[in-house]
A protein has these predicted regions:
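N-terminal amphipathic/basic leader segments beginning at the initiator methionine
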Residues: 2-45
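Mg2+-dependent prenyl diphosphate-binding active-site environment of isoprenoid biosynthetic enzymes
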Residues: 34-35, 39, 45, 49-202
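Short "domain-exit" segments at the C-terminal end of structured domains
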Residues: 203-207
Length: 207
């Protein structure tokens, strides 16, 4: 468990205030939450196991494919600014990774993607049906975990965010091919990607 903020720890290691702004690198901050990220990785893999072998296979295929885990890392870093990183922030970070992974499985079907994270996309191996349903499972798993945290505000934030992400997917589907409407394009980016990233620094992780 972290007792001091990794962000503040890195700031204290550099020189003047001007140097602090120039010298802090993401990898230096992430290094300070290495033990927590290792524990998170164990949670992510262990808790996804089910009695349905195909679900296990598809979920492990994408979760073990080398993702950067940037979104859950942001959850932990944001939480560390206000309190030590205990189990609640770790579980929220886990939820965020499940949600993100679910969107990747769905997105690859919508886009007809052949690869994901330098390997064959799940849909290329097990088909669209298994890929979509595995994404649905991860989504359901994430919201089940949210209910165990007994934090209504957090549940509302996550519910609203996933609604916006679905709107973004549909907006992209309905967008005219070859359209150069910049406003619509930026709206799609916000709904599909940015809104999930923004909640990492705003979501309440305390019960």
């Amino acid at each position: 468990m972290i007792t001091n903020s990794p962000v503040r720890n890195v700031q204290n290691e550099v020189g003047s205030p001007e140097q602090k702004n120039l010298q802090i690198r993401p990898e230096e901050i992430l290094r300070n939450i290495g033990p927590e990220m290792d524990l998170l990785e164990k949670f992510i893999i262990h808790d996804i196991d089910t009695d349905v072998e195909l679900l296990n296979t598809v979920a492990h295929h994408i979760l073990l494919a080398g993702g950067k885990r940037l979104r859950p890392a942001l959850v932990l870093l944001a939480s560390s600014l206000f309190e030590s990183i205990g189990e609640s922030p770790l579980r929220v970070a886990q939820v965020v990774e499940y949600l993100h992974t679910a969107t990747l499985l769905h997105d690859d079907v919508v886009d007809g993607a052949e690869t994901r994270r330098a390997q064959k996309a799940a849909r290329q191996i097990w088909g669209n049906e298994a890929s979509v349903l595995s994404g649905d499972y991860l989504l359901s798993k994430a919201f089940h975990m949210l209910t165990t945290l007994r934090n209504l505000e957090l549940l509302q934030i996550m519910s609203r965010t996933t609604t916006l992400m679905a709107e973004g997917e549909i907006l992209q589907l309905s967008r005219q091919i070859g359209s150069e409407d910049e406003e619509v394009y930026l709206r799609i980016i916000y709904l599909k990607t940015a809104c999930l990233s923004l909640i990492h620094i705003s979501e309440p992780t305390r019960p």
